[in-house]
Regions:
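Sec-dependent N-terminal signal peptides
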Residues: 4-14
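Ser/Thr-centric signal marking residues that sit
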Residues: 7-8, 34, 59-60, 124
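Sec/Tat signal peptide C-region and signal peptidase I cleavage site
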Residues: 16-20
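Alpha-helical cap/lid subdomain in secreted, periplasmic
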Residues: 22, 41-45, 62-213
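Catalytic nucleophile-elbow at a beta strand-turn-alpha helix junction centered on a G-D-S/GDSL motif
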Residues: 24-39, 56-59, 88
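A structural signal for the hydrophobic beta-strands that form the central parallel beta-sheet
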Residues: 28-29, 52, 122, 185
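A short beta-strand-loop structural module common to alpha/beta enzyme folds
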Residues: 48-62
Length: 213
């Protein structure tokens, strides 16, 4: 066998062996609910390399600005996209992302991940408990458009549309976590330790088929 061909085959086999050893990588892309720690539990469930790319207070618009560095540069096998709780903060117009733009941003994120060769899982935003939430945020902007739950459901519907239009797995945490209110911390937004585990379990079911588990 010619030396150059042999060298090429050795390099190819070495590359394939390294990739197999590395195994699948999952990047969890989101806000403070992601940052709170479900990716660590997800990694334990999947026995896979799971990266926590959550950032407190972030919207889809903010996420797009850090996506290359925090997500794509990691060369993920799967990206779990989980935004919405901050996008719908109508009481802070400097933060809020209108629902139509939220839908476009989710589509842009999904398209960029697919272009990079990663599979995508879309999550809907979880429930919000209005009593503690409105101790921190003004209620009037929500009341003007039909109330907090109506607003939240509009953002969840947008996430569902993105998943459906792009034939992506959907984890409907808005519906799933509503059945287990113990997931929620007293602030009405973030997960308890038990909630972190529940979120990881729900997401794991969508990710497993994508990484051959």
């Amino acid at each position: 066998m010619p030396r150059t061909l042999l060298t090429t085959l050795v390099l190819l086999l070495t590359s394939l062996t390294a990739r197999a050893a590395d195994g699948p990588k999952v990047v969890c892309f989101g806000d403070s609910i992601t940052k709170a720690g479900y990716p660590k539990v997800l990694g334990e469930i999947l026995k896979a390399d799971v990266v926590n790319a959550g950032a407190g207070g972030h919207t889809t618009a903010m996420g797009l600005k850090r996506m290359q560095k925090d997500v794509l540069d990691a060369k993920p096998t799967v990206v779990v996209v989980f935004f919405g709780t901050n996008d719908c903060r109508l009481a802070e117009p400097e933060v809020a992302v209108p629902v139509a733009q939220y839908e476009k941003n989710l589509t842009t994120i999904a398209d960029a991940c697919a272009k990079a060769g990663a599979k995508v899982v879309i999550c809907t935003m979880p429930p919000i408990n209005p009593e503690p939430y409105f101790k921190r945020h003004k209620k009037e902007p929500f009341d003007k458009v039909g109330g907090l739950e109506k607003v939240c459901e509009e953002y969840r519907a947008a996430a569902r549309r993105v998943a459906e239009a792009n034939k992506l797995p959907l984890v409907d945490l808005g519906a799933q976590l509503a059945k287990t209110p113990e997931w929620m911390a007293p602030d009405g937004v973030h997960p308890t330790p038990a909630g972190t585990k529940l979120i990881a379990q729900h997401i794991a079911e969508a990710v497993k088929p994508l990484i051959g588990k």
